[in-house]
């Protein structure tokens, strides 16, 4: 069972989850552990889960550019700004903070090996603007042989 399955089982029974072009990334290409998971969890827990009405959507699309594999994680949730207001008094999560700390270490060894960007207001909807996370991974980095 994975992160999406658990969220569907507990909170988002009607979630529509789509993965596109997974075969673009070679099966022997190893990603840093948890990299995609943190972005997917944030999309579900802080975005999509706060929708009052469906549809509840999560899309992961894989692309191949010149030097990078691209992973786009798009949700139609409430967006990061509204989510931060809802979670204002709750404890601060460490998922993205830890991920960016890891990226800082990796990128200090290999220039621009991994980049993560977030884009808001993906959809033209006043209440459910959505968020897109874009992860860029250099083709040439072997993360398995990487020593911290």
What are these regions (language model features)?
Residues 1-119, 125-127, 136:
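Two-component histidine phosphotransfer core
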Residues 124-148:
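C-terminal end segment of the histidine kinase catalytic
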């Amino acid at each position: 069972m994975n992160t999406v399955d658990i969220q569907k089982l507990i909170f988002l029974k009607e979630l529509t989850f789509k993965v596109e072009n997974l075969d673009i990334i070679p099966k022997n290409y190893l990603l840093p552990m948890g990299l995609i998971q943190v972005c997917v969890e944030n999309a579900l827990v802080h975005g999509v889960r706060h929708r009052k009405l469906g549809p509840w959507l999560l899309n992961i699309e894989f692309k191949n550019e010149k030097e990078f594999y691209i992973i786009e994680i798009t949700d139609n949730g409430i967006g990061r700004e509204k989510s931060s207001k809802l979670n204002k008094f709750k404890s601060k999560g460490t998922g993205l903070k830890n991920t960016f700390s890891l990226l800082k270490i990796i990128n200090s060894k290999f220039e621009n090996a991994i980049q993560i960007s977030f884009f808001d207001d993906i959809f033209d909807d006043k209440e459910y603007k959505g968020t897109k996370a874009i992860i860029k991974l250099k083709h040439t980095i072997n993360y398995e042989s990487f020593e911290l």
